[in-house]
């Protein structure tokens, strides 16, 4: 049975979950598929081409959370939904945020961004304000998810835990802000509040 491009991408994502991005190689992927490494070049020009496709697939398959905004919903509802969906797409795979940061945008991504820019400009944002808002939001989602995944990948047993005994306020604040979902939602709200303020 002939190997399809999609089969290679799926195997790549499975291997990513097993070994992480740093240890993902075309040689290991070929072994996983039971083929010789040069065969992969029939489907992808190079490793970067494969990583781009893996990232695009992970994002395309991201769970929409069952709460897709209704047509005509306000711009901030759409941006919040988009941010959460991107985060879920990255969290669905080990090193998903690292994969996203190492990949180039898929061609259809530009059409998606164009639609968001149109929506934001209709809401009253300038072209520059709309683009900066999208960039800030995207960088926030990528950065917080990257930190969340890297923290999860660290060997907590070997890590030296700080002693906050002498700093009770810091200790309480760290514990109170520990939940990654609540932390993400707080930052998301701050960004959207800042964008709303630009329209006032």
Feature map (PLM): residue ranges:
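Helix-turn-helix
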Residues: 7, 11, 15-53
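Short, basic, alpha-helical segments at the C-terminal edge of helix-turn-helix-like DNA-binding modules
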Residues: 57-61
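Actinobacteria-biased recognition of intrinsically disordered, low-complexity terminal regions
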Residues: 1-6, 27, 200
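Amphipathic alpha-helical packing segments from all-alpha helical-bundle domains
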Residues: 81-82, 100-136, 142, 156-166
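C-terminal peripheral helix-coil segments that are non-catalytic and often amphipathic
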Residues: 122, 150-200
